[in-house]
A protein has these predicted regions:
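Alpha-helical elements of the RecA-like P-loop NTPase motor core of helicases
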Residues: 73
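Residues in and immediately flanking transmembrane alpha helices
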Residues: 15-16, 44, 197
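Alpha-helical transmembrane segments and their juxtamembrane interfaces
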Residues: 12-13, 41, 194
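Serine-esterase "nucleophile elbow" of acetyl-processing enzymes
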Residues: 19-68, 78-87
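Positively charged n-region of N-terminal signal peptides that target proteins for export
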Residues: 1-4
């Protein structure tokens, strides 16, 4: 009996880490738009994306490292720790909206996001950058320059881009909560489709690269 327990302990010690290592991670690194603001966590697009991922790619999991109110500077300060903790293969980077709403300089937003991307790349994490837009009352020049940040970063760092997280409903009031800023539960289903379209392609490409002979 003692020998049997020793064998079981040996198997658990060496096989369990292998099983854990086979699970790959997608980390969502964002603000309140990704943190289920104003609704149950299970109703948010990240939870819906998790369900989709578990159905289509069972060897992947999602970690939501989003914080309501987060800025690009805040993300820059905590990205290293998040990468060390979760070791994601893919990072969905959804930051910048709060900076824009507060009128932060275009230069600071760009540089903070660029630093986050560079750190992710150094840690061998692919980046899926999520673009945002601002309401027109922030001025034509500022809103245009803000919107241009995301495609510029995607081109400069050769990373995947979702041009606008709220594509298809960004100007439709019925898809927003009472504050007029945060998407409601109905809109979450639209967001997950927007994200999934790009994410699934990244995962498929990664699988092909990992198993070129299959």
């Amino acid at each position: 009996m003692k020998n049997f327990l020793i064998i079981l302990t040996f198997l658990f010690t060496f096989l369990a880490p292998a099983t854990a290592a086979s699970t790959k991670t997608v980390m969502v690194f964002g603000d309140s738009l990704s943190a289920s603001h104003g609704m149950p966590i299970e109703a948010g697009w990240v939870a819906l994306l998790t369900q989709r991922l578990q159905t289509k790619f069972t060897d992947y999991q999602i970690i939501n490292a989003s914080i309501s109110g987060e800025t690009t500077l805040g993300g820059r300060n905590r990205i290293k720790q998040s990468l060390e903790t979760h070791r994601p293969e893919i990072v969905i980077l959804e930051l910048g909206a709060n900076d824009g709403l507060r009128g932060a300089t275009i230069k600071s937003i760009y540089e903070n996001l660029a630093t986050i991307i560079e750190i992710c790349k150094k840690n061998n994490s692919q980046v899926l950058l999520v673009g945002m837009q601002l309401p027109p009352n922030y001025g034509r020049t500022y809103t245009r320059k803000f919107q241009a940040i995301f495609p510029q970063l995607a081109e400069n760092y050769q990373i995947k881009l979702i041009p606008f997280l709220l594509a298809g409903f960004g100007e439709k009031h019925e898809f927003f909560q009472a504050d007029g800023i945060h998407p409601n539960e109905v809109a979450q289903k639209k967001i997950v489709e927007t994200v999934w379209e790009v994410l699934q392609t990244m995962i498929k490409t990664e699988k092909i690269a990992a198993n070129p002979d299959n």
